[in-house]
Amino acid sequence: LFDDTVYKNITIGRPGASLDEVVDAAKAADAHAFITAMPQGYETALGERGVKLSGGQRQRLAIARAIIKKPKILLLDEATSNLDTGSEQSVQAAIERILGGRTVIMVAHRLSTVKNADKIFVLKKGGLAETGTHEELLKLGGVYKGLYEAQT
């Protein structure tokens, strides 16, 4: 995040977006409630001289930024890493809401993040080990199943 307002942090990829568009993106990213609880809402300063955000709040602002940009391809790299369970669930719900109508590439060690993906590619030692849906990979009984069972 940048040392600027919440509004400007969300619109960095699409300057000039209306407040209504920013609010819609924040709602889809499950960020609107914590933003409106801040002293100046969307005009609250963030960063060194402003409000400090939790990891989950930062992730949800990043998701709002992606939503407002409306990319055809979205890359999410460890979107739920280092989050507590509540924040992880909130970020996962936000991700689920923005998946439709675009190609999303997710890099994740937490398999719960990719469980609903159309296709999962499992890498091991720098190579492709398995590919399939969550259900197909569990039935296969290989690397993915072992990792999934270790995490649940």
Model-derived features: positions:
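ABC-family ATPase nucleotide-binding domain "signature/switch" substructure
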Residues: 4-9, 16, 23-31, 41-143
